[in-house]
């Protein structure tokens, strides 16, 4: 909040339970459960370009179909998405996705905020912890004394 204020962006937080937030994420900004919010900050894992970009920028992913929470739409983006989805060769698909990414950065429909919530401290009773190199931690290696 303080960092954004330095950029002349004044925000107020409406802190809600995480699952409620996720439910609204699918319902969209027009739903009463959004409480009049003009933005949302939802944690998610982006595992591939389609999961990371397409569901937030395609007019075909408006709620309740998917997670285009703010109903962002741009015909150019839809064209790049269609090109990527129908390209079965790596180079044309990657080129369309790279252009989509560049346009997302240029148009800036989002502010990308990351807060690493990965565990970094454990009780001494927990053994076999392998610190993650990404957002996910493998609990299969762990045990308790």
What are these regions (language model features)?
Residues 1-2, 22-145:
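Detector for C-terminal structural segments
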Residues 11-18:
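Short beta-strand-to-loop elements that line the ligand-binding cleft
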């Amino acid at each position: 909040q303080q960092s954004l204020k330095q950029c002349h962006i004044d925000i107020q937080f409406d802190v809600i339970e995480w699952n409620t937030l996720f439910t609204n994420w699918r319902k969209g900004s027009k739903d009463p459960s959004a409480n009049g919010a003009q933005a949302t900050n939802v944690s998610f894992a982006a595992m591939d370009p389609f999961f990371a970009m397409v569901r937030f920028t395609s007019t075909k992913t408006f709620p309740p179909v998917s997670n285009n929470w703010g109903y962002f739409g741009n015909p150019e983006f839809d064209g790049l998405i269609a090109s990527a989805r129908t390209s079965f060769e790596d180079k044309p698909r990657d080129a369309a996705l790279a252009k989509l990414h560049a346009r997302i950065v240029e148009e800036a429909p989002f502010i990308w905020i990351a807060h690493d919530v990965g565990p970094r401290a454990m009780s001494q009773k927990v053994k076999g912890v392998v610190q993650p190199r990404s957002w996910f931690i493998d609990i299969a290696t762990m045990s308790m004394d």
